[in-house]
Structure formats: C-alpha cells, structure tokens
Amino acid sequence: MTVTAAAAAMTAAMAFSSLAAVAKVGTQEFNSLQDAINSAGESPVVIDLEENVSLTDGLVIGAGKNVTIQCGTSDPKTIKMEGKGIHTEGTYDATAKSWNTSRLTFKNCVLDIAANDNPGGSGRTANLISNTDLTLDHVTWTQNSANGGSGSGMYLYQKSNLYLVNGTVMTISGYKGSRASGIFADDSEYEDMPNRSIKISDHSSLNIIDCDWHCILRS
C-alpha cells in the first residue's frame, strides 16, 4: 500500500511538473515566462513559450539582456497582459559615458495588452522601453488603454529602437487621456544623441488610433 501510494504521488508530481512548464530555454523548463527571462545573462538566449500566458504584473527585461521569445509557428502562443505592460533596461558604461542597449525580440507571438502602467511604475506609460532594441518578428500586437488614462502606450526612452518585421501587425489604441500618445519619445537626459528609430519592413504595419495628443510623438 505504501509503495503504491508513493508511486501514485510520484506520478502525480511528474504530471504536475509537466503541466506547469510554461517556457523552456534549451531543455531547461520554467514555470513562468518571467523566470525564464530572469535566467538569461548577457549572452543571447532563446525562450520557447510552451503555453498561453496571462499576466497581471507585466514583464521585466533586466539590464544587459539579449532575449528572444518564440511562440511557435503552427500554434502561436498568446501573451496576455492586464494592468501592466513591459519594462526593459539597458546598461550604462561609465568609462565610455554611454548606454549599451539591451535586446528583446518577440517571434511568432500574439500579444494582447490592456495596460496603462509598467512594472517599473515610471514614465507614465504602459511599456517603458529603455535603452533597448525591441523587435517584433511576425507578431500580432494588439494594445488598448485599460482605462483611457493619461499615459502613453509605449515610451521609447533614450537609446531605444522599435523594429517591425516579417508581416508584424501592431495596433495601439485608446490612450486618450490628457496629452496621451500612442508611442512617445523624447530626448530626456539624452539630448542630441542618435536614438529612437521606428522601422517597419517586410509588409508589416503600425496602426495607432484614438489617442489624445499625438499618435506618435517624438520631441
């Protein structure tokens, strides 16, 4: 009886472990997408998303990371975010007195975002892309303001760039609070420096609608 019970418990534990694996880096499994991201160092890392995920705390891409999140081809996975979007950071080279960009790529993913804030809580934006190259590769990105608040849909801060490639469709709407923008960028603490490119290629499209101030504001 004891052996049978132990075997049953082990089988149940194995089944739970298998079901709980949300993402993989190589053969290593993770129970959350954020855990998989946190495991990355400065070397390029590819994360395979195994399941659809629904997030209320957003995603944080730490300084210096180079992360690609793949969501499959035959059955693309969905990343749903409610309340908070994405916060990325770069690294500062004190000797060179310049920022080194981080890199974040979503590939074959569906992103469904309803947010007005980000995990860092700064920038008055749903997605704070700070000193980072953000690439959307064959991605469907649909984003709406959670409550029509005053912040922007995305803030490209300092040395940040946005690339839409391979048929990506990005739609941002509903940021119609006072002086709200779909995508916002300025030269805060980065005056007269090369930064903040938005490049759209390979039959991709960027649609920003129903915002108060400017759909895309670069000052």
Regions found by a protein language model. Give the residues of each.
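Small side chains
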Residues: 23, 72, 126, 167, ...
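Right-handed parallel beta-helix
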Residues: 70-75, 102-115, 133-145, 161-176, ...
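Flexible, charged surface loops at secondary-structure boundaries
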Residues: 37-43, 61-63, 99, 129
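Extracellular beta-strand/beta-solenoid scaffold signature
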Residues: 55-60, 80-97, 112-129, 143-159, ...
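Right-handed parallel beta-helix/beta-solenoid
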Residues: 11-35, 52
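Bacterial N-terminal signal peptides that target proteins for export
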Residues: 1-8
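N-terminal extracellular ligand-recognition/capping segment immediately after the signal peptide
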Residues: 28-30, 44-67, 74-83, 111
